[in-house]
UniProtKB/Swiss-Prot annotation:
PROSITE patterns: ZINC_FINGER_C2H2_1, ZINC_FINGER_C2H2_2. The keyword Metal-binding applies. Interacts with WWP1. Interacts with ANP32B; this interaction induces promoter region-specific histone incorporation and inhibition of histone acetylation by ANP32B. Transcription factor that binds to GC box promoter elements. Activates the transcription of these genes. This is Krueppel-like factor 5. The keyword Repeat applies. Keywords: Activator, DNA-binding, Isopeptide bond, Metal-binding, Nucleus, Repeat, Transcription, Transcription regulation, Ubl conjugation, Zinc, Zinc-finger. Ubiquitinated. Polyubiquitination involves WWP1 and leads to proteasomal degradation of this protein. It comes from Mus musculus (Mouse).
């Protein structure tokens, strides 16, 4: 303790100035800059004892003459030795080479020492609050949790799948991402979609396009609804229909591996039954179809024999009106919308048929007439209507009728003879004109 007191008192006493050649390199560079303008500010900035000794002591008086005591020599020696010790300067934050803002040279230090009062240094806030954009992205983690779009469900719901499937493979080790993407990475492991922390990640299969496979199943469904085996009491009919529909709808599933696991658990709430699927429900060509719509093609004499198999005697007009006003039974199988709606074939008449338009090459050259024909004979007969020529004369006695076309004369001649060559093969009714027979055949079809 006495030694420490002596040291403190010795420091307060006069000390000789050290020579300039023995100064440290750092203080040698700062000496032209510091000066003695504001001693209080220099004391706040430099906490080293050597700086205080170098700038704050008054000029030392000449030492007293006389012999020196050993304690005084020890104090003097210790003071001289303290000059060579490392001064305790404030710690300087370490900045990387590419982040140095100013050079560590003596020519730039003078900007930190100005005559203005206040903060002695222009404090760089980047030293105390570093910019995170210059840091490595791998060292910075976002505080916001990553939002994952994973639908989680308890494991107990899918217990039947874990029993029938093989145990899941062990999870793969975590794969490290590059540094520029590690800021977005979260602590997750690359594992198959199985049980993770008692949470099951549900794998939802895409919904199959039912309209693609419906045409192949429509015949079987229609056959199922029209078989007489379903006309049984409701107690057994319900379970049989449900099992059959289960098998029928299982054919629509594009993933056949999932059928044994899911088809047995669809109707768990229903009582078990021992109904076996009949052979007529197996995939085969259906034999029950709704009746096809009647053909609306006009009849002709050469097709009468072909239409005999499908025609019935025409009903009376009263029966026709009554059938249009009658209410159809909704339970009839014909009312089931089984077959996909197909557009009826487009029918053209003689004026709108595109095939006939291509073959119509004979134009009428009469002024203002736009008639076109496929045959030259038809055009010649048409030109007689413009010229008024009627070369075909009726040969019946006392008849002076003349016609421009031969078919018109033939039709007229039947009026004299009473011939009716066009006969209906269904009702045995005869007509003198073919168009009259075609109109009559439409009544049989309707």
């Amino acid at each position: 303790m006495p030694t420490r007191v002596l040291t403190m008192s010795a420091r307060l006493g006069p000390l000789p100035q050290p020579p300039a050649a023995q100064d440290e390199p750092v203080f040698a560079q700062l000496k032209p800059v510091l000066g003695a303008a504001n001693p209080a500010r220099d004391a706040a900035l430099f906490s080293g004892d050597d700086l205080k000794h170098a700038h704050h002591h008054p000029p030392a008086p000449p030492p007293a003459a006389g012999p020196r005591l050993p304690s005084e020599e020890l104090v003097q020696t210790r003071c001289e030795m303290e000059k060579y010790l490392t001064p305790q300067l404030p710690p300087v934050p370490i900045i990387s080479e590419h982040k140095k803002y100013r050079r560590d040279s003596a020519s730039v230090v003078d900007q930190f020492f100005t005559d203005t009062e206040g903060i002695p240094y222009s404090i760089n806030m980047n030293v105390f609050l570093p910019d995170i954009t210059h840091l490595r992205t791998g060292l910075y983690k976002s505080q916001r949790p990553c939002v994952t779009q994973i639908k989680t469900e308890p494991v107990t719901i899918f217990s039947h799948q874990s029993e029938s499937t093989a145990p899941p493979p062990p999870p793969a080790p975590t794969q490290a991402l590059p540094e520029f993407t590690s800021i977005f990475s979260s602590h997750q492991t690359t594992a198959p979609p199985q049980e993770v922390n008692n949470i099951f990640i549900k794998q939802e299969l895409p919904i199959p396009d039912l309209h693609l496979s419906v045409p192949s199943q429509q015949g079987h469904l229609y056959q199922l609804l029209n078989t007489p085996d379903l006309d049984m009491p409701s107690s057994t009919n319900q379970t049989a229909v449900m099992d059959t529909l289960n098998v029928s709808m299982a054919g629509l599933n594009p993933h056949p591996s999932a059928v044994p696991q899911t088809s047995m658990k669809q109707f768990q709430g229903m009582p078990p039954c021992t109904y076996t699927m009949p052979s007529q429900f197996l995939p085969q060509q259906a034999t029950y179809f709704p009746p096809s719509p009647p053909s609306s093609e006009p009849g002709s004499p050469d097709r009468q024999a072909e239409m005999l198999q499908n025609l019935t005697p025409p009903p009376s007009y009263a029966a026709t009106i009554a059938s249009k006003l009658a209410i159809h039974n909704p339970n009839l199988p014909a009312t089931l919308p089984v077959n996909s709606p197909t557009l009826p074939p487009v029918r053209y008449n003689r004026r709108s048929n595109p095939d006939l338009e291509k073959r119509r090459i004979h134009f009428c050259d009469y002024n203002g007439c736009t008639k076109v024909y496929t045959k030259s004979s038809h055009l010649k007969a048409h030109l007689r209507t413009h010229t008024g020529e009627k070369p075909y004369k009726c040969t019946w006695e006392g008849c002076d009728w003349r016609f421009a076309r031969s078919d018109e004369l033939t039709r007229h001649y039947r009026k004299h003879t009473g011939a009716k060559p066009f006969q209906c093969m269904v009702c045995q009714r005869s007509f003198s004109r073919s168009d009259h027979l075609a109109l009559h055949m439409k009544r049989h079809q309707n």
